[in-house]
Amino acid sequence: MNMEVDTVTRKPRILLAASGSVASIKFSNLCHCFSEWAEVKAVASKSSLNFVDKPSLPQNVTLYTDEDEWSSWNKIGDPVLHIELRRWADVMIIAPLSANTLAKIAGGLCDNLLTCIVRAWDYSKPLFVAPAMNTLMWNNPFTERHLVLLDELGITLIPPIKKKLACGDYGNGAMAEPSLIYSTVRLFWESQARKQRDGTS
């Protein structure tokens, strides 16, 4: 990862994104974890809004939705939201990553704000995903193929954990806890910043 000089001296800019999994009920908690350390902006897919508790989001975190993509653009020359967010962010984290959004990213689809950001992402910058889905969906052969494609893009997987799922089943597929997602990203960022300061790669 190539970090510009100013990214070493200022707060990191973290773009958090939620896709349509019931684990999106933890999205506000995730935003609070990161907002203590970094500048945070958030993106929520239409289906994730069934679970995201918007009133409990940190006051300093702006939440963008698909509607904002279109309402912010009126004519040629106006800023394009998914491009502006990609430019702004140092790191993107999709948590939770649903089976559907995983498949979209693996196939290169870009039919909402979240997937447009990923399609336009600069892969010299880190992108993390924390999947959340039913155990049989996680174990599905398509999921394995899709994860291989994400790995080839340079996307970092924060694996799901084994527990009793929202559907009542017990098994692997629950999103990693927000505290673990936060610590994983922060440790990565601080390691890269230290290497940058020391002049190593």
UniProtKB/Swiss-Prot annotation:
Disruption phenotype: No visible phenotype under normal growth conditions, but homozygous double mutants hal3a-1 and hal3b are embryonic lethal. Expressed in roots, shoots, leaves, flowers, developing siliques and seeds. Induction: By salt stress. Keywords: Coenzyme A biosynthesis, Decarboxylase, Flavoprotein, FMN, Growth regulation, Lyase, Stress response. One of its GO terms (biological process) is coenzyme A biosynthetic process. Its EC number is 4.1.1.36. Its cofactor is FMN. It comes from the Eukaryota. The active site is at C167. This is Probable phosphopantothenoylcysteine decarboxylase.
